[in-house]
């Protein structure tokens, strides 16, 4: 009977030994001194390498959005000036003004993505990377100097536990320091991949790691297990990594990476957003207008400008927008060429100015040009009749003029002139038909029968410093500014320019 029992026991021992021989990669229950399996270490490092790049990715995204906003504000100013300087391209300039506004809004929305939880998640990624790197460097550093294959290590081969090549610097990328570059990596995918690692964290051999030694005996009394990385790994109280707990089983409730696993895909999508800008150069305009696909980007802005009534919107938008800009596939548009012909005096400081081509003007120059243009248009609008379509009768005009007693005020009206020799005070300011027909800035008139200056006579021959009060210095010549714009158009340009200045 005893012999049979001994034989049965021997068979059990042999079966266990056979199982260990056939499956050397399978770790036993936690064993004091066992190293972390290199497979698990590399999984942690792969995640860490991605996580530490998220701050660089965020910096890249914010820089793109900020640059797009700045350039689009410049494009907005450029379009506002074009609206004033190119009456024949009013719709083109207005379309680009609205398009630039949309681009500014897109850039602002991209920046606002990072005012709350998304930035916190990027911070969490960086924090988790730091935690992993330090643990991995600690484990890899606890090893016997010498060739691979020795068994005194805290980071060893999953099958056997022997020392492996050092890999933390490369796999975790711990040597980057402050030179980490953006790489558009997906933190959500990285967290998901880590959460799927099912390998037992404890290597199947080795017993020399001091970090995973028996906590209870080596420290006299250590009642609890030792969690690492918020519980992703756990050193058992009796030593070794806790059996039955892989990264896959620990990840769902792990606060270090669970939020990144659940929300990281959204963060990655926002980090990958590239905010484009409105055009500010001739080449950028060419790109935007040189193909049907690119021109389609202007449709929302053009629709907003036209506010089409039902049935009025062109069926072929591309044909319409090509006509608006004078555009052809692969060529500079007529609008872009017209902009190239505009030069404006820009202040240099100290009372000095410099004539600059519109494309070459910086935001500061464009702002000054906008302010000057608005002032010119306001002056021109103020000298226009209140109702251009209404022709006053002599009786109506005399009634209006006769109420004015001051000579300067009388002469400031485009249809009144002051007669200083008239003895009747009610008749000194009278209607001047010649002056009214010219519909230009007023001139002083001693007698109602004297001739008023025409717009051309008033401005022709004046030097640059004297070219003002309804005149405009353009192309080295003093010209009448009122012939360039009607009152209604002038006011619309002022409004558009003011809108641009508000952004």
UniProtKB/Swiss-Prot annotation:
Lipidation (GPI-anchor amidated aspartate): 480
Signal peptide positions (record): 1-29
Positions annotated as propeptide: 481-503
Cellular location(s): Cell membrane
Family annotation (Pfam families): Trypan_glycop, Trypan_glycop_C
Topological relation to the membrane, as annotated: Lipid-anchor; GPI-anchor
Top-level division of the source organism's lineage: Eukaryota
Disulfide bridge partners, by residue number: 45-172, 154-209
Keywords attached to this entry: Cell membrane, Disulfide bond, Glycoprotein, GPI-anchor, Lipoprotein, Membrane, Signal, Trypanosomiasis
Matches recorded under InterPro entries: Trypano_VSG_A_N_dom, Variant_surf_glycoprt_trypan_C
Glycan-bearing residues: 113, 419, 432
GO CC list: plasma membrane; side of membrane
GO biological process: symbiont-mediated evasion of host immune response
Location (main, coarse): membrane
Function per UniProt: VSG forms a coat on the surface of the parasite. The trypanosome evades the immune response of the host by expressing a series of antigenically distinct VSGs from an estimated 1000 VSG genes.
Protein name from the UniProt record: Variant surface glycoprotein AnTaT 1.1
Source organism: Trypanosoma brucei brucei
């Amino acid at each position: 009977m005893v012999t049979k029992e001994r034989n049965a026991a021997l068979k059990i021992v042999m079966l266990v030994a056979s199982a260990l021989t056939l499956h050397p990669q399978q770790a036993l229950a936690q064993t004091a001194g066992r190293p972390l399996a290199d497979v698990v270490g590399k999984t942690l490092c792969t995640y860490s390498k991605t996580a530490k790049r998220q701050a660089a990715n965020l910096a890249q995204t914010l820089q793109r959005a900020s640059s797009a906003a700045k350039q689009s504000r410049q494009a907005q100013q450029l379009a506002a000036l074009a609206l004033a300087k190119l009456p024949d391209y009013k719709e083109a300039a207005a379309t680009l003004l609205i398009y630039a506004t949309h681009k500014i809004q897109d850039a602002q929305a991209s920046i606002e993505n990072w005012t709350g939880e998304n930035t916190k998640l990027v911070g969490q990624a960086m924090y988790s990377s730091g935690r992993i790197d330090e643990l991995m460097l600690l484990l890899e550093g606890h090893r016997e100097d010498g060739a691979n294959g020795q068994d005194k290590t805290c980071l060893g081969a999953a099958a056997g536990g022997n020392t492996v090549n050092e890999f933390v610097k490369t796999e975790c990328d711990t040597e980057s320091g402050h030179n980490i570059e953006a790489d558009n990596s997906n933190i959500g995918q990285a967290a998901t991949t880590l959460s799927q690692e099912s390998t037992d964290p404890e290597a199947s051999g080795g017993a020399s790691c001091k970090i995973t030694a028996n906590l209870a005996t080596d420290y006299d009394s250590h009642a609890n297990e030792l969690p690492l990385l918020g519980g992703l790994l756990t050193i058992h109280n009796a030593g070794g990594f806790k059996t039955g707990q892989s990264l896959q089983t620990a990840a769902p409730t792990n606060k270090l990476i669970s939020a990144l696993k659940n929300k990281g895909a959204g963060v990655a999508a926002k980090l990958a957003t590239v905010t484009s800008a409105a055009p500010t150069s001739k080449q950028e305009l060419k790109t935007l207008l040189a193909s049907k696909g690119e021109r389609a980007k202007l449709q929302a802005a053009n629709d907003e400008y036209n506010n089409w009534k039902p049935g009025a919107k062109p069926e072929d938008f591309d044909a319409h927008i090509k006509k608006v800009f004078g555009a052809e596939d692969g060529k500079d548009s007529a609008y872009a060429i017209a902009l190239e012909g505009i030069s404006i005096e820009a202040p240099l400081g100290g009372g000095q100015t410099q004539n600059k081509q519109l494309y070459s003007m910086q935001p500061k120059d464009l702002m000054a040009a906008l302010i000057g243009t608005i002032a010119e248009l306001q002056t021109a609008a103020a000298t226009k009749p209140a109702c251009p379509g209404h022709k006053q009768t002599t009786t109506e005009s005399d009634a209006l003029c006769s109420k004015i007693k001051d000579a300067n005020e009388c002469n400031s009206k485009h249809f009144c002139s002051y007669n200083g020799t008239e003895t009747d005070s009610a008749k000194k300011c009278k209607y001047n038909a010649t002056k009214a027909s010219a519909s230009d800035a007023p001139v002083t008139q001693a007698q109602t029968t004297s001739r008023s200056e025409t717009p051309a006579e008033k401005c022709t021959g004046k030097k640059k410093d004297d070219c003002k009060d309804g005149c405009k210095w353009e192309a080295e010549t003093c010209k009448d500014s009122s012939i360039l714009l009607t009152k209604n158009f002038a006011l619309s340009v002022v409004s558009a320019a003011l809108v641009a200045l508000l952004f």
